[in-house]
Structures are given as structure tokens and as C-alpha cells.
């Protein structure tokens, strides 16, 4: 009985040792869905009560984007366009080759600022969702966001397709045609 007990302890020790050796750092964070391009930087941005928020939109779209940030319990003050330190900027820009779709965005996080650029409010919304995934609690009501450069655009023109084959019977050729149209 003593040999089995010792064998179990050795196996448990080796398993724990293996788990410790294969643990990875949180620097390479995952984002769902995976962005088109993501490059890690050095350092991190500290999102806190002192961080300012600048949005170059007016009205309902600006209010909806501000509401997205309420997922984090940090109250951000209003900022100005000329602010460059400790600011989160959401900017609508001209359509260009980097932002081919209305849902495309670029997200740049440096230790000084966070900048999300898009050609529409939809792109800013998806950039905000990515930012919320990157935010890690760092204590005392603040969040740490690792420095990163992200460019993202939708891979497909449609976000989803529903085929109800239980009530509306379709041929195999029809379903293949629908999938091919995506």
C-alpha cells in the first residue's frame, strides 16, 4: 500500500511540475474573433478615473459608444482632441485602404493613449468590444491594457446565415448554392 501511495505522489508531483512549465504569460492575449492583424507592443495603458474620453461623434452614436464603456466600472471624464496623454480617443476617419468596410477598425494601445479609428460608428463599436476584451483588472478600480496594434475588418460580407431545415426542407444543391453565395 505504501508503494502505491508513493507512486501516486510522484505522479502528482510530475503532473504539477509539467503544468508549471507549460504555463504561458498573459502578454499574448486572445481576442475573439481573431483580428486580421495583431502586433504586441511593450508596456501597458492604465485605464483609471484620470483617463479622459474623446469621441468625434455627436448625438446618439456618441451616447451608445459611451454606454459600451459602462461594462468597466471606471467613470471617464470628457477629453479634448488636443489631449495626447492618458486619453481614450474614438475617431471617425475617411474611408481608406486600411479601413475598407464600415465595420473595419484600427486599435492602437500605447502607454500614453488608446486610439480607435473607424469609418463608421459600427467600426468604433467593434473596436470597443475588442478593447473590452483586452482590459484586465489591475486593482483599485483601474484596468491595465497591454500595448498592441490591431487592424481588423470582417472576413465575410455577412455575419451569419440561418437555414431552418427542420421546417423548410431544402435540397443539398440549394444549401451548397446558399453557402457559395456567402
Segments the model singles out, each with a brief description of its role:
Residues 1, 17-20:
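A detector of low-complexity, intrinsically disordered, Ser/Thr/Gly/Pro/Ala-rich segments
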Residues 1-7:
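N-terminal secretory signal peptides that target proteins for export/translocation
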Residues 15, 22, 175-178:
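An exposure/low-complexity boundary signal
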Residues 155-182:
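Substrate-binding cleft of carbohydrate-active enzyme catalytic domains
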Amino acid at each position: 500500500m505504501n508503494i502505491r501511495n508513493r507512486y501516486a505522489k510522484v505522479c502528482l508531483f510530475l503532473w504539477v511540475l509539467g503544468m508549471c512549465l507549460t504555463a504561458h504569460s498573459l502578454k499574448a492575449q486572445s481576442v475573439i474573433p481573431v483580428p486580421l492583424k495583431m502586433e504586441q507592443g511593450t508596456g501597458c495603458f492604465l485605464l483609471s478615473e484620470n483617463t479622459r474620453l474623446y469621441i468625434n461623434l455627436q448625438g446618439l452614436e456618441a451616447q451608445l459608444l459611451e454606454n459600451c464603456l459602462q461594462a468597466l466600472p471606471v467613470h471617464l471624464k470628457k477629453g479634448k482632441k488636443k489631449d495626447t496623454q492618458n486619453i481614450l480617443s474614438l475617431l471617425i476617419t475617411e474611408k481608406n485602404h486600411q479601413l475598407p468596410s464600415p465595420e473595419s477598425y484600427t486599435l492602437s494601445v500605447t502607454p500614453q493613449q488608446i486610439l480607435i479609428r473607424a469609418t463608421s460608428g459600427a467600426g468604433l463599436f467593434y473596436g470597443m468590444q475588442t478593447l473590452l476584451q483586452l482590459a484586465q483588472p489591475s486593482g483599485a478600480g483601474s484596468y491595465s491594457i497591454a500595448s498592441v496594434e490591431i487592424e481588423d475588418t470582417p472576413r465575410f460580407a455577412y455575419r451569419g446565415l440561418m437555414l431552418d431545415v427542420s421546417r423548410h426542407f431544402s435540397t443539398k444543391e440549394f444549401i451548397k448554392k446558399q453557402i457559395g453565395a456567402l
